[in-house]
Amino acid sequence: MGMRKYSWALILAAALCAAPAVASDLPTKKAPEEIVAPALPSGWQFEITGYGWGTWLSGQAGVGPFPSSPFYLSLVKLLEHFQGSAMGAFVARNDTFIGGVDVILARLGGGTNVEDPTSALYGSHANLTLTEAIVTAFGGLRIPIGPPNLQLYGTVGARGFHLHTALDLTSPVPGFAPTFTLTKDWVDPVAGLAAHYIVNEKWFVNFLTDFGGLDNSATGQALGSVGYNWTSSIATTVGFRALYTYERQVDGPLRDFRYQSWMYGPFAGFKYSW
């Protein structure tokens, strides 16, 4: 009996000594990974873009009892009469809201000599200038559809127009230098969509469209562009834009103003954001 008890004691001691070694060979349970809180939205993002838009212009216009006359100006022809422009946009957005303003200022001009000897203005020089301003302001809410790298907003706003035409005549007759001017201003409400799609850290796509108007006016535009982020703050974009305008103002039988136009062509922009 003494030997049997001694043998069992040795077996038990050996088992206790071997248990840690066996346990060290078993796979150990990993410690739970630290849960990292998702990054919160960075708040408002602001963008300022300066751009140049090379446009073709077509449409028709008329004043008073005279019939409307069609017109078409290619980009080359517009550049021949180009006297200056300024174009830019400002946009502020976050995960819920968007707001912005777009400004287009342009001036065209040209002159000619009246060489028809039967004209009462024979020998005069006529100089025509056209100044146009188009300002669009909008705001909107994000539409929660699509992948997380798509920001799609429904927008409402207004687009204001200013047209100023001046005709200056220089006559060989002393003291005779008449000037004729026509100025028209109007504002149209608009509604549409604005989208910003992030392809990756470098590339992105922008799209914007809207349409609106009142009883005697209408306007609409579509814009698409591809952009490249050179740094976290600086990007460049290239794209295509089309803008439609229609306006009629009747202030009397001799003051019937009619204007309809399409402006369309490529553009390139430089954007700074923060």
Spans of features found by a protein language model:
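Bacterial N-terminal signal peptides that target proteins for export
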Residues: M1-L10
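Bacterial N-terminal signal peptides
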Residues: A9-A18
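Short glycine/proline- and aromatic-enriched beta-strand/turn motifs that initiate or cap beta-hairpins
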Residues: V22-D102, G265, G269-S273
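Short loop/turn motifs that connect adjacent beta-strands in outer-membrane beta-barrel proteins
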Residues: V36-W44, P144-Q151, N200-K202, S232-S233
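Residues on the lipid-exposed face of transmembrane beta-strands in outer-membrane beta-barrel proteins
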Residues: I48, G88-N94, A137-L141, V156-A158, ...
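Extracellular/periplasm-exposed beta-strand and loop segments of Gram-negative cell-envelope proteins
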Residues: W56-Q83, V103-I134, F161-W186, G213-L214, ...
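Transmembrane beta-barrel architecture of outer membranes
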Residues: W186-G192, S217-S225, A235-T237, S261-F267
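Transmembrane beta-strand segments that form the barrel wall of outer-membrane beta-barrel proteins
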Residues: W203-S217
